[in-house]
Design a protein with these regions (language model features):
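Short, flexible micro-motifs
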Residues: 36-37, 126, 271, 315-318
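Residues that flank catalytic or metal-binding motifs in active/ligand-binding sites
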Residues: 50
Length: 353
């Protein structure tokens, strides 16, 4: 559905009104380097053209109505209704709306669609879009930090902050301090993602253990970015968890890779980005306990013609590839993966926005 069709659908579903129609759009977050989902870890991210698009209009009343363009049912929240009366995704939506309880929000009519496939989470894109839409119809002003905190709804805020701080044509550095944007000139390239059914490991507990051990020796540090290689070498004997030690070693080196790439992107040098993404991939293969299906996907892609960079992402990989080589790459990866693993991976083609 294109944008005029989505707008027309809004007017078909909701009664006429003189209130202004607001538009919000947020793409799925793609991590180029670092690890946005890990507490205290730096990351370099961009948003993709797979996105949530949302139209919203103030409603004269004490309720919020939300519909998906893919469904006929309408979610209705009447102000003051206890969250305990809702279940599942509806309860999450209510908790998100109630993050704005202290901001005197107005009622609203909302229609959204999503081009994010079902096997990828749209949680960040939807949450940020909903909070931004409700603030627009209520004339509430907030900066990226506050919007991210509201959208996160008590979850780790980094992915939401990266989403709110994004800028078209740029990637976003999340480290200690305020997010920073750097040019991301990917003209002539697309971002191909390939996904398998193998689950991604939860490494957060090991990393918290390692970070706490280092902070006992260096209490002034507030993030992994602050840990120098010298500090890590001094403190690593105190990290008894050998898995945590490997993970932290990767993260310390990832910080250096991000620094090299952001310096290069100031000059619009994408070659350094591609090189360090590939170096990050090799580091993850060695230290990050990557599953066999993820490894096979990466090895299928990295030797194909036109591929500039490959890196693990979510339940699969991202591949920065020349536009005219995409179809061949998909066919080759699909055939080789199915022949060896036994099923076909799923693919998405998008652009960095």
């Amino acid at each position: 559905m294109n944008l005029p069709e989505l707008k027309e659908d809004f007017y078909k579903r909701y009664s006429s009104s003189d209130n202004y129609l607001h538009f919000t759009s947020n793409g799925i977050l793609c991590t180029l380097l670092g690890h946005c989902g890990i507490e205290n870890a730096p990351s370099l991210t961009c948003t993709l053209s797979m996105r949530v698009r949302m139209f919203a209009r103030a409603l004269d009343g004490n309720m919020i109505k939300i519909q998906s363009s893919a469904e006929n049912k309408c979610f209705v929240y009447i102000f003051g209704t206890p969250p305990e009366l809702f279940r599942g995704a509806d309860k999450e939506t209510v908790n998100l709306i109630r993050m704005l309880d202290n901001h005197k929000i107005k009622g609203a009519q909302i229609l959204y669609d999503s081009t994010i496939p079902e096997f990828l989470s749209k949680k960040e894109a939807f949450s940020v879009s909903l909070i931004q839409s409700l603030m627009k119809v209520s004339s509430i002003e907030a900066d990226a930090l506050e919007t991210a905190a509201l959208s996160a709804c008590s979850r780790p805020a980094a992915p939401y902050l990266a989403t709110t701080a994004t800028k078209s044509g740029y990637c976003t550095l999340l480290s200690s301090g305020i997010p920073k944007n750097y040019p991301l000139p990917l003209t002539g390239y697309k971002i191909l993602s390939a996904h398998c059914t193998e689950s991604e490991r939860d490494r957060s507990g090991h990393i918290r253990t390692a970070f706490s051990s280092i902070r006992r020796m260096y209490p002034h540090i507030s993030s992994i970015t602050d840990i120098t290689p010298k500090m890590f070498n001094s403190a690593k004997s105190a990290i008894k968890d050998k898995i945590a030690l490997r993970y932290m070693y990767h993260l310390i080196n990832e910080t250096a890779r991000i620094a090299a790439v952001t310096a290069a992107l100031r000059r619009c040098d994408t070659r350094t980005l591609f090189r360090e993404m590939n170096n990050s991939q090799k580091s993850m293969e060695r230290f990050w306990d990557i599953g066999s299906e993820h490894l096979f996907l990466a090895h299928c892609a990295e030797r194909l013609d036109g591929v500039a960079a490959v890196r693990f992402w979510k339940n699969g990989i991202i591949v920065i590839i020349e536009e005219d080589k995409i179809d061949h790459a998909i066919n080759m990866i699909r055939h080789e993966f199915e022949s060896n693993i036994g099923y076909q991976p799923t693919f998405c083609v998008s652009e960095a926005l």
